[in-house]
Amino acid sequence: MPTVPFHYVDLRAFAYATEDEKRVADALRTFLPDDAEIDRVENVGHHGDRIVVLSARIENADGMRHVLDALADLDDVERVIDELDDRVDDNCALFLRVDKQAAFRGDVRLGPGITVRAKVEAYPAKQPAAVENARETLTRLSDSHGDGSTPENGSTLENGSTPEDA
């Protein structure tokens, strides 16, 4: 991907008192480059329980490519593309929620747990232009990861074997 049409990407997850904070951080790291720092803020919930907010902001192009590459493994990329009018707000921010438990296992799918907010480059900075830029990017990602035959994405071939087995 030669250019990245985002100004930055924010990722955030909550580690509740019943969860292992390290596992939540590991789930968040599924989407982050190795050198990304995770910010930690400890809060107290309404009933006095501990809630830790783990977040990271990626602002450099290589880091954003890493995040996008991880998101390209989403099974529901076509669904996200179809819902872009609802997922991009008037401030040109694209919102996704990915499954925290699946991310901990190294899988990428839509669901609760990790919020992804990407500020889409759009000139003029209007929602329709941002939707179109996000659509082009996600379509390109989907096309480049859609054949399922590259060992890098850990996918399987039609017969269920991995590319290394073929």
Language-model regions: role of each:
Residues 7-14, 94, 116-120:
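Short glycine-/aliphatic-rich beta-strand segments at the starts of folded cytosolic domains
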Residues 69-104:
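Mid-chain, well-packed structural core segment of small domains
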